[in-house]
C-alpha cells in the first residue's frame, strides 16, 4: 500500500527543537509540532527527596509527503542527530489519511 504522507517523529534533548526544525525546513518540511516529554527508558533511577527524576526531552512531529521524508530525516540526523548536543533520533510512520493540510500546489 502506498501512502502519500508520513509522520516523522523526532525525540531529542530538551531545548534543541530549533536545530531539528531548521534542518527539516531546509530539506523541505513545512513545519512541525513540538511537545515537551520525559524520558523513562533509561536505568538512571536518580531520585531527589524520593521523587524519581527523568531526562527532559522534546518531541517534534512533522507531517511530510512520502517522497520528501528521506531527505528530511537525513537532514535532521546530520544536523541534530545522536552525535550532536540535540541527540535526536527519528523514525517515521505511514499516515493513511489527513484532513486540514494545505496541498502542495496551494503553496
Regions found by a protein language model. Name each.
Residues 1-107:
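Positively charged, small/polar-rich N-terminal and surface patches that mediate targeting and assembly
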Amino acid at each position: 500500500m502506498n501512502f502519500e504522507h508520513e509522520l516523522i517523529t523526532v525525540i531529542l534533548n530538551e531545548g534543541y527543537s530549533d536545530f531539528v526544525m531548521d534542518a527539516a525546513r531546509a530539506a523541505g518540511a513545512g513545519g512541525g509540532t513540538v511537545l515537551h516529554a520525559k524520558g523513562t527508558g533509561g536505568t538512571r533511577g536518580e531520585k531527589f527527596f524520593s521523587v524519581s527524576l527523568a531526562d527532559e526531552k522534546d518531541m517534534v512531529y512533522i507531517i511530510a509527503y512520502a517522497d520528501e521524508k528521506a531527505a528530511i530525516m537525513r537532514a535532521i540526523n546530520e544536523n541534530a542527530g545522536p552525535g550532536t548536543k540535540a541527540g535526536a533520533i527519528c523514525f517515521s510512520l505511514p499516515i493513511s489519511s489527513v484532513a486540514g493540510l494545505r496541498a502542495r500546489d496551494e503553496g
